[in-house]
Structure formats: structure tokens, C-alpha cells
UniProtKB/Swiss-Prot annotation:
It comes from Rhodospirillum rubrum (strain ATCC 11170 / ATH 1.1.1 / DSM 467 / LMG 4362 / NCIMB 8255 / S1). This is Methylthioribose-1-phosphate isomerase. The keyword Iron-sulfur does not apply. GO terms for biological process: L-methionine salvage from methylthioadenosine. Substrate binds at R53, G54, A55, R90, Q207, N258, K259. The record marks C168 as: Transition state stabilizer. The lineage of its organism: Bacteria, Pseudomonadati, Pseudomonadota, Alphaproteobacteria, Rhodospirillales. Keywords: Amino-acid biosynthesis, Isomerase, Methionine biosynthesis. Its EC number is 5.3.1.23.
């Protein structure tokens, strides 16, 4: 995407090699600051401290972290150490594990003296793939928005705009470029469709108010920042035509783990018959997990993120301000799980599907579990279970 007219990705290699540059997202929207990451430790810190965030971008950054680790120590022990260091940074986003496993697999058979160069090339390929996947998500999501426009009569001069609510930041700042949930919105805006975006502030880190609003404003997309608890009211009064969010991990059965508060938006959308879509690339699907509520680890972050807010004062200084009484404890769950039954559809790079095992298997047949022979003991047990459920 463009930053002040300059095409910009969220992560890019230094011209002379041996380092990568990132956008320090903790400084937005008040300052646009880039930071150079020179080694594995710097990459791990950037992920842990959320200088970079969003599942796809975390994965891409981790890939470069492995590459920088190979420049430091290309031995088998060095590869293991780099992967373990990065895996420990944040537990919920599955793209982190996916990218690290992809790097480790591609480097395992490479001689140590060639690993640094091979790792650098592989990390770049992962970033390029992310951009292509996200643009494809945008194309498929655009089709849904066009259908909404026809239903609402917007294309024929009917009452507009198309009001879309989003939660947290699943734009280009959460990926290498384009974004997931926001990619269809950018495509729709650029196609001339009259859209308006309701932007949840997304406490406690205010990633909607700080990051999504900054993105949309930079691109010229009409939007309004709202308090997190406003969405249900807007839906009750017919002011939301569609909800679209991203995801940090999606199960093989269509459950979605996303920023805390997503589940409440899905409940409100379900109660008011508002379509609720989730946008995601294939690497965000965790094919090893079936029950999101029971199996996905939920990151708990520092309570200070809840008890303090960061912003610009009237004097122009950027400061942290405490908003809770001294001594009041705070809980800071970073994510929640939205059950598949509340989701209208999943928008992927391969198309749109139902949030279900069958829906995902239809788009990713190579990842679908092998069928159990009907005559086997497992098959008979499964059949008995299915019959009992009836």
C-alpha cells in the first residue's frame, strides 16, 4: 500500500542485506517510524512487544528471524535455537508456527555454509506469497460486497453507502501487504463502490482506532471510529450491512480465534441477521485443531495494557496515562474464540466457503482428513456416534 505516495510493505530487507526493516506499529497513528532489525534477538523482541503484529505479518517476520539466526549460527543447533526462540514469542497466532516450520523444513537438507543465503531467499518468498494470498482474498471478498450493493440497490442509485463493521486491525499493517479483512474493502473502494466502515476502537491496545483508522484514512476510505460496545446498537438499527474480521487461528472445523471482543460482535450479528464473514489465508488454518474453545491457547498479556492508555496530550507530547485506581487488578486476555455456527462464511485466497470441516475441505482437499474405511473398527465407531447424534 502507499504511505505518503510511496509503495510500502510492512517488512522489507535492507538494501545491503543482513537486516530487515519494519514499521514500528506501537508508534502509530501519531508517528510513522521504521526500525531496523539486525539479529534474531531483535526480531523476537519486535514480535513479543508487538512492534509487528497480525498473524500473517508475525509469520513473515519470524521467517526473516530464522534467516538472521542462520547468519549468526547456521549449524543444526543454531537452526533449532532460532526456531525455539521465535516459537516462544507469542502462542496464539498459528502463522508463526507455520512460517517457522516452513523455514526449518526448507533448510534441513541445506549444508550449513549455504543456509544463510537459502534462508534469506525462503523468507522473501514467504513474504511475496503472503501478498498474493491477500490480494486474492480481496478479490473474493469484493464479490460479496458487490452482491450486497446489488441487494441494497446502491449500484442503481439506491440508498447508500454499504456499511461494514470491522474489529481490530486486519489490514495491510497486519500482513505484508493488502491485509485480510480490509483487502475487500480497499478493492471495493477502488472500484467506486460507496462503502463506509465502522471501526471498533478495539481495547485494550486500540488497534482499530490507532491502526485501522490510520490505514483507511491514508487510503481515503470513509470511516467512523466507534467505542467497542457500539456495534450491537448499530446492528439493531439497521446501520450495519456486513461484518468482516480477520483471524489469528482458524480450526479445521471453522472455529475462529481473533482479537478479544470478536465473539461478542458475532453474537450481535447473529441476533440481528447481519452477515458475519472472516477473512484468512490458508496458512492461518490450524489443521491439527478441531475445537477452538478447548484447544487454542489464549495469550494473556500485561495488565498495564488495560490500566493505561497511550496518546498525544494537548501540549503535543506522547504519553502513557493511567486510567484505573491504584491497586485495582486487571485481566488482559488477548483473544477469544467465535464458534463456526455464528460465522456466515470464510473468505480465503481460494474462494468463500462455509465455516465447517466440509467447507474448508472443499477448498483445501489436500488437507482434508483421509476417509475412514466403512468396514473398519474406527469407521463403525464413527457411524455409531453419528447415528446416536441423530
Amino acid at each position: 500500500m502507499n504511505v505518503k505516495g510511496t509503495p510500502t510493505r510492512t517488512i522489507w530487507p535492507a538494501r545491503e542485506g543482513g537486516a530487515v526493516w519494519i514499521i514500528d506499529q506501537t508508534r502509530l497513528p501519531h508517528e510513522f517510524v521504521t526500525q531496523r532489525l539486525n539479529d534474531l534477538g531483535a526480531v523476537a523482541h519486535a514480535i513479543r512487544a508487538m512492534l509487528v503484529r497480525g498473524a500473517p505479518l508475525i509469520g513473515a517476520t519470524a521467517a526473516y528471524g530464522v534467516a538472521l539466526g542462520m547468519a549468526e549460527d547456521p549449524s543444526d543447533e543454531g537452526l533449532t535455537r532460532a526456531c525455539q526462540t521465535l516459537l516462544a514469542t507469542r502462542p496464539t497466532a498459528v502463522n508463526l508456527r507455520w512460517a517457522i516450520e516452513a523455514m526449518a523444513e526448507s533448510l534441513a537438507a541445506v549444508p550449513p555454509d549455504q543456509r544463510a543465503q537459502a534462508a534469506w531467499a525462503k523468507a522473501g518468498a514467504i513474504c511475496d506469497e503472503d501478498v498474493a494470498l491477500n490480494e486474492a482474498i480481496g478479490d473474493h471478498g469484493l464479490g460479496i460486497i458487490k452482491d450486497l450493493a446489488r441487494t441494497k440497490g446502491v449500484e442503481k442509485g439506491g440508498e447508500g453507502p454499504i456499511n461494514i463493521l470491522t474489529h481490530c486491525n486486519a489490514g495491510w499493517l497486519a500482513t505484508v501487504d493488502w491485509g485480510t479483512a480490509l483487502a475487500p474493502l480497499y478493492k471495493a473502494h477502488d472500484a467506486g463502490l460507496p462503502i463506509h466502515v465502522w471501526v471498533d476502537e478495539t481495547r485494550p491496545r486500540n488497534q482499530g482506532a490507532s491502526l485501522t483508522a490510520w490505514e483507511l484514512n491514508s487510503h481515503g476510505v470513509p470511516h467512523t471510529v466507534i467505542a467497542d460496545n457500539t456495534g450491537g446498537h448499530l446492528m439493531q438499527h439497521g446501520l450495519v450491512d456486513m461484518v468482516i474480521v480477520g483471524t489469528d487461528r482458524t480450526t479445521a472445523t471453522g472455529d475462529v480465534c481473533n482479537k478479544i471482543g470478536t465473539y461478542l460482535k458475532a453474537l450481535a450479528a447473529f441476533d440481528n441477521a447481519v452477515p458475519f464473514y472472516v477473512a484468512l489465508p490458508g496458512p492461518t488454518i490450524d489443521w491439527t485443531v478441531n475445537d477452538g474453545l478447548r484447544e487454542i491457547p489464549i495469550e494473556q498479556r500485561d495488565a498495564a495494557e488495560v490500566t493505561r492508555v497511550w496518546g498525544r496530550t494537548a501540549a503535543g507530547a506522547l504519553e502513557w496515562v493511567t486510567i484505573t485506581p491504584t491497586g485495582s487488578p486487571a485481566a488482559n486476555y488477548a483473544f477469544d474464540v467465535t464458534p463456526a455456527r455464528l460465522i456466515t462464511g470464510l473468505i480465503t485466497e481460494r474462494g468463500v466457503c462455509a465455516a465447517s470441516a466440509a467447507g474448508l475441505a472443499g477448498l483445501y482437499p489436500e488437507r482434508a482428513p483421509a476417509p475412514v474405511p466403512a468396514g473398519s473398527a474406527a469407521g463403525k465407531g464413527a457411524a455409531a456416534t453419528a447415528d446416536g447424534a441423530l
